[in-house]
Amino acid sequence: MASSANSISTHMTMRLWALLGLLGLIWGGSFFFARVAVAHVPPFTLVLLRLGLAALALHLYLRGRHGIYPALAGRWREFLLMGLINNAIPHAFIFLGQTHIGAGLAAILNATTPVWTVLIANVATEDEKLSTAKFSGCLLGLAGTVVLIGPSALAGLFGAAGDVPLWALVLPVLAAVSYGFSASYGKRFRNLAAPVTAAGQLTASTLIMLPVAVLVDMPWTLPMPPLTTVLAILGLALVSTAYAYILFFRIMAEAGATNTSLVTLLVPPSAILLGYLFLGEMLQPTDVGGMLLIAAGLAILDGRVLKLGYSAGR
């Protein structure tokens, strides 16, 4: 869900805002679909189905265009690493966490991705160093993460009945960290067409998850899931992964990386709304407080809030 492309335009038309809102709804829907599916499909098998079906859909979309096959043959090692840190690891961690937490909370924890991206880029790159504003935004985002994880984790340490286990809260955060590494590593794919990069990493991550799912879940022994689960898997793979990537890169081509990154703020509200309407999930006050801290941190990282305040004060 992160990109390192250079910003192209700072002007957002109503059409681009509408597309950005649609993308936020779609990616928020991925947490909803996953919450439905993990009730009947083990996490590793679910990751395999999501990635495999999405990769197939993107290959059908590309139909051999943009040099997809030479790119796969020539850069398969890079695609394997990108697929590992941008798909296989984060998806597996999020789905494992969602066996115990709701769609909304998982989306909020994953919304810390830009915070980790900034911190990792400060060490891993030469051109994206921390500024005072970025550091402040990171602190707010990390504070929001602590608020979200802290109360449940402390209660769990004392054995309170019904509390969410600590690992279920930590795994989505580790998924966000993995996305942060992939954002810096992904810079090496700038010379490829964006759909080729997406198809390449999805193909590679499918190959990574295939032996994991076979050895751990033994999917051939699983009962046939109900129709609602099948539909959730199709929605997760085709809508929230394959189509979302195409939409994401289309917005980025017109609006640039900075504007497109605002989708991170739109994902948790849509996941929370879908979880509330269809799954009966309710957020605690600490969840809302943590989300607001993370949102404030992301707004500072984006930079436009500070620019508006500076302009108003002149």
Give a label for each model feature.
Residues 2-48, 84, 96, 156-188, ...:
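Glycine-/small-residue-enriched transmembrane alpha-helix faces in small-molecule transporters
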Residues 26-31, 59-110, 145-147, 237-255:
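Specific transmembrane alpha-helical segments of multi-pass solute transporters/efflux pumps
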Residues 29, 33-36, 40, 54-72, ...:
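Membrane-interface helix-cap regions at the ends of transmembrane helices
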Residues 40-89, 114-120, 177-182, 198-218, ...:
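Transmembrane alpha-helices of multi-pass small-molecule transport proteins
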Residues 45-56, 86, 94-133, 145, ...:
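Specific alpha-helical transmembrane segments that line the substrate/conduction pathway
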Residues 49, 87, 105-112, 183-207, ...:
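Helix-helix packing/entry segments at the starts of transmembrane helices
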Residues 58, 80, 112, 120, ...:
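Hydrophobic transmembrane alpha-helices of multi-pass small-molecule transport proteins
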Residues 58, 117-119, 123, 141, ...:
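Transmembrane alpha-helical segments that form core, pore/gating elements
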